[in-house]
């Protein structure tokens, strides 16, 4: 059987003319009186700006005042509930610095010394805070930070300062 060819009729499509007017669509209009009464003034008075000099920013929660023991327990509990491994690090200098070279390197303050091993299997936030107290006793003039490490994705998920040495200029107290 021979193939048959069917003639198709060409349909003409109008060229694109741009966006059409929305005048035909229903529009809900608000009265000007109601929008004039809306104000964000209460929030604006409460907002604060981080000073550009005198207070260094550290980690995730650096904009807050120093965390109390209860606040630290809540943060570590969240870390553990998220299935992250707690890890403690400490450093005499709590911020990034470049002393010997202009390019970044291992010794520019990004990598802190790990306290013991990561706390695999830790299920209690008080265990982590007990280790923070041990670091503070051993190195009273060092910064201590808590890290939450996701060992499945091999990434650091959270990091915050748990202790700043007394008299540090970066805490905003001096």
Curated annotation (Swiss-Prot):
<comment type="similarity">
    <text>Belongs to the RuBisCO small chain family.</text>
</comment>
<keyword id="KW-0602">Photosynthesis</keyword>
<comment type="function">
    <text>RuBisCO catalyzes two reactions: the carboxylation of D-ribulose 1,5-bisphosphate, the primary event in carbon dioxide fixation, as well as the oxidative fragmentation of the pentose substrate. Both reactions occur simultaneously and in competition at the same active site. Although the small subunit is not catalytic it is essential for maximal activity.</text>
</comment>
<keyword id="KW-0809">Transit peptide</keyword>
<keyword id="KW-0601">Photorespiration</keyword>
<dbReference type="GO" id="GO:0016984">
    <property type="term" value="F:ribulose-bisphosphate carboxylase activity"/>
</dbReference>
<keyword id="KW-0150">Chloroplast</keyword>
<feature type="transit peptide" description="Chloroplast">
    <location>
        <begin position="1"/>
        <end position="45"/>
    </location>
</feature>
<dbReference type="InterPro" id="IPR024681">
    <property type="entry name" value="RuBisCO_ssu"/>
</dbReference>
<dbReference type="Pfam" id="PF00101">
    <property type="entry name" value="RuBisCO_small"/>
</dbReference>
<keyword id="KW-0113">Calvin cycle</keyword>
<dbReference type="GO" id="GO:0009853">
    <property type="term" value="P:photorespiration"/>
</dbReference>
<keyword id="KW-0934">Plastid</keyword>
<dbReference type="GO" id="GO:0009507">
    <property type="term" value="C:chloroplast"/>
</dbReference>
<dbReference type="InterPro" id="IPR000894">
    <property type="entry name" value="RuBisCO_ssu_dom"/>
</dbReference>
<dbReference type="GO" id="GO:0019253">
    <property type="term" value="P:reductive pentose-phosphate cycle"/>
</dbReference>
<keyword id="KW-0120">Carbon dioxide fixation</keyword>
<protein>
    <recommendedName>
        <fullName>Ribulose bisphosphate carboxylase small subunit, chloroplastic</fullName>
    </recommendedName>
</protein>
<dbReference type="InterPro" id="IPR036385">
    <property type="entry name" value="RuBisCO_ssu_sf"/>
</dbReference>
<dbReference type="InterPro" id="IPR024680">
    <property type="entry name" value="RuBisCO_ssu_N"/>
</dbReference>
<dbReference type="Pfam" id="PF12338">
    <property type="entry name" value="RbcS"/>
</dbReference>
<comment type="subunit">
    <text>Heterohexadecamer of 8 large and 8 small subunits.</text>
</comment>
